[in-house]
Amino acid sequence: MSALSRVVDTPEETLRLAVSAVTDAAGRDENQDVAAALAIGGGPSGGGGDFLLVVADGMGGHPAGDVASQIAMNTLMDALPALPGDDLGLALKQAYRRANETVFRAGEEEPSHAGMGTTLTSALLHGKYATIAHVGDSRAYLLRGEVLTQVTRDHTFVAEEVAQGRITAEAARRDPRRNRLTHVIGTNPRLEGKLPDIFELTLLPGDRLLLCSDGLYDVLDDSEMRRALGEQDPGAAARQLVEAAKERGTRDNATAVVAAAIPTRVPTAATLPSPASRTGGVPGTVIAVVIAILLVVLLLLAVVVLGAPL
């Protein structure tokens, strides 16, 4: 497990970004999932102020799924700091293409690894901005308030049928073909079409971002994920999600990577005390009484000077 945090300024608040990753073999003898939550770049604490979150799930039932997922994640982590520019989506696309080529070549060079592949879902956190890249059926979710939204779209035959209206989302959860993938990293020399899918988000105070493998979301419903993600500490949230998947009897590896945008209030003009209260000024009621007394005194003086009877 890894856990890091940093602080970024927003106009009226400070966001403390905290991240954590947990993975477990869970329902299988070996763990073909890999995960990371780490600072990248050359800044303080070993990072440039940016976070990289990664989940990769090696293809089950195929050779060397664990090798494919590890190569893909390592290539992604190596490639991103070397990619210049402010276009994080482009940087992720280039890194994904490099990861795909590296996994494919490794499969060609080692006969026992031929045909290996992996999912790859990642997020670059740059200040309050999150850029997500995705290939396969691992997922990214955003929890905002009480609303949990699936950000990514599964690259599976069943997901395509749901999108085309042929079956319902509920039926898809029970469909025996739900794990048949249409796109993965490493099985072809080049990624198809416009892959990876890119999604851009602006994180708000209180948001939670979750990356997870299918061994987790297959057995947990939205309400269970919402409850776990409500934990203030992302490490506790990630552990709770993985343990819940194991308790639900997942037959696959279970992985959760959580990022929390924790609000830390700073003073604003609306919350600062008034100048009078900051400097110990005289209350308005006292001033009014003093003015009234002065008026009475002036009136008495006028009467005495003019010689008028009281």
Model-predicted regions and their roles:
Residues 1-310:
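PP2C/PPM-type serine/threonine phosphatase catalytic domain
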